Amino acid sequence: MAVLLRRHAWAVGFSGLVAIGCSPSTHNGGRVRGEGHGPPSPVANGGAPDPSGFYRQIGMIAQSGSFPFVGQLRYLAGSSADSTLSLVTLSFANRSLTFTGDAGAQRAAYTVTLDVTQGTTTVRHVETHKQIRVASFHETQREDESVIFQQFLSLAPGAYSLSVSVRDDGGGNANVQQMSVTIPRLGPHTLSTPISVYQVKPRVRLDTVPALIANPRSTIVLGRDTLAGLYVEGYGLSTSARVDVAVLNDAHVVILRDTVNLVRQGDLSSALLDFPVASIGVGPVTVIASLASATDSVQAPLFLSFGDEFGITSFDELLSYLRYFVSPQRVQLLRDTPPDQRAAVWAAFWKQTDPNPSTLENEALRDYFKRIATANTRYREEGLAGWLTDRGKVYVTLGEPDQAGQQFGTNTTARGRAEIWVYTQYNLRLIFINQSGIAHPRLSSSSQADFDKLVRRLQSQ
């Protein structure tokens, strides 16, 4: 029986296969995601503290720098009691790669190297070379999750060191993460670690691998995804086995409980733990699963956000993004919400600010976060995210100006240059003055006052 978590269409299929403990060149998986799956990340553009440290803290694979990537290590039972099937998943952006023209399209190549060691002994070395091809230059500049890599490894239970290296073959970008890992033994009456997936077809034999497309970032995009899904397997269980599930928010408060029946097929049982996004709220959550009446449990992170790479690591961080969307008083009311009421209060806020309740999306919030992403690209200054600059905050609040132009002083030099934005709808004319000569325009005092007055009026409506 196929279990499919339907989120959105995929433009390109797998360019390879996945296999257990494979040799380097043939049995590996990569996938290029289709266009239009959320805005570029404000995090990637400096819109919030780099979340890679937080990801590593909760056991994920993550690096920032010139070649940022995010991923996870998940475990399923192997073909024997002395083997565990370990799944390494990675996600990174097209923009990290160097593309060259190829018959009207764009092509890039990358290498992923996995080294598993115990002391001075190399237990597994896998070097995978992949190529991707996109249709246009525009796609090469994407900063959202564009490439998904996944690799299954068969390893004996025990303690290891894992090195994950990703390199752009066409340029100098590269990054590496080293981490200590403990591979569990998954015997009878145990569960696999849950795997966040875009789609999955469960396996029926332990000597095979499930046909799945992993979600390395475990990100659920509000307005796009209606369900948050995790694939889990059970071993040596009866046909009536069930899994108890609890979802905890970032304050460690249980916000959802459920019981899911495992489906027995062949040698093993499996289930898709899926939850309505509206019942969870927004921000990071932890999903804990255990066999009914058992004391041991497994867990996995999920991040409910507004884009694949938004990197929102707490409810408070989400609220910091809303400073130009609603009044400070309204943000504070959300901030003061007790942790066990956040999901309900956020659902009410979503409904109140949704201009078109007949759709699954909140178009106002969707467009607002898209403007944050655009502002980070256009208006970023050294040490300051684009959406927090003067031009950025105006753009995020009001959108594209109806007219925009530049005006120079009598000396026609960059110093004293003025940039003028006009918003006809609001009868507003804003002047940004660049006194530094290094493209850091600031609102004039009168324009700042006019803008603040308009913002107060809009936020009071």
Residue ranges and their predicted role:
Residues 11-21:
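Bacterial N-terminal signal peptides
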Residues 14, 114, 394:
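Short hydrophobic/aromatic patches on the structural cores and recognition surfaces of FHA
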Residues 1-12:
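Bacterial N-terminal signal peptides that target proteins for export
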Residues 23-282, 293-323:
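Intrinsically disordered, low-complexity terminal regions enriched in Ser/Thr/Pro/Gly
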Residues 4-5, 17, 114:
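Leucine-biased recognition of intrinsically disordered, low-complexity hydrophobic segments
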Residues 252-254, 266, 279-280, 303-461:
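Residues within mature, well-folded domains
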